[in-house]
Each structure stands twice: as C-alpha cells, then as structure tokens.
Design a protein with these regions (language model features):
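Select subsegments of transmembrane alpha-helices in polytopic membrane proteins
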Residues: 7-8, 65-69, 91-103
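Membrane-water interface of transmembrane alpha-helices
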Residues: 24-28, 61-77, 143-149
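Cytoplasmic juxtamembrane regions at transmembrane-helix boundaries
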Residues: 72-94
Length: 156
C-alpha cells in the first residue's frame, strides 16, 4: 500500500475515533461545557453540551476537503511546488498535513470532555507539540518549494 493510502486510512480512523469518543461521552456531560481556551489552556468560554458536536463536524469537513484536494493535484487553489503536483505526492503531503490536524481535534475534544467531567482543570501543552508537528510538515513543503524555485532559476 502506498504512503498516501496509509495516511488516508490513519486519518479516517482518527475521524471515526473522534466521533465515537464524542458519542460515547455525550450523555454523561454536564449541561455546560468548556468551548474555548486561552493561550495558557485555561477556560475562557463555555456553552451548552450540544456544542461538543462542533469539533467533530469541523474535523469531518476538513477530512472531505483534504480528500477532494488530493484528487485534483492540478488545482490552482493549491500553492505547492510543481514537484508535488503528482497525485501520489500531493496525497502524501495533504494527508501528512491532515494527520496533525486530526490529532489536534482529537486532543482538544478529549481534553475538553475531561475538563467538563472535572478530571483535569485546563488544556495540557500537547496542543503546542501537535502544532509544532504541523509546522514541520508545512516547513518541509516550503523548503522543497524554495529549493525547486532555485533550481528552476538556475536552469533558465
């Protein structure tokens, strides 16, 4: 199986876990749950427990969006190096970028529910590590793009 296929399956599995965990925990949630956190992970916004469905819905939308993008590597909406415009490469890049996004959604949902259940008091620093992974993926694409641009200029 190709790398992009494996990444797609892992991302799809994470989406199923996000929905399953939310469904399992929903009935036991208090009527008001944390919905927003400040930079330090402390709660600065709350809403009714129905708002817990927002993050799984956004994660699902992002999954469909990334899947659609991976199917059209020539899209003018993609700002990627020409070397990424092959279907296999764009799939690896897009699904590599989606992976930390899905992990981030899962972490925020799990931690929000744990805070609502009073099992922890604030978000952990895991969010920052996950964002770091996402920036590494973006940075890798950027470095490849810059190198490709320099090679094209030297060939002209």
């Amino acid at each position: 199986m190709k790398t992009s296929g494996i990444l797609f399956i892992v991302n799809a599995f994470l989406l199923v876990v996000i929905w399953s965990f939310t469904v399992m925990k929903y009935a036991g949630l208090p009527d008001v749950i944390p919905t927003h956190f400040d930079f330090n992970g402390k709660i600065d916004g709350q809403a009714g427990k129905d708002s817990i469905w927002t993050l799984p819905c956004i994660a699902t939308f992002i999954s469909f969006l990334f899947f659609a993008i991976s199917k059209n590597p020539q899209s003018s909406l993609l700002n990627v190096p020409d070397s990424f415009r092959e279907k296999q490469k764009i799939g690896v890049y897009i699904f590599s970028l989606q992976l930390p996004v899905m992990i981030l959604f899962l972490d925020i949902i799990v931690e929000s529910i744990r805070i609502a259940e009073r099992k922890q008091t604030e978000l952990s620093n895991a969010v920052f590590y996950i964002l770091g992974i996402m920036f590494v993926v973006i940075g890798t694409g950027l470095v490849i793009s810059i190198r490709e641009g320099k090679i094209k200029k030297s060939d002209q």
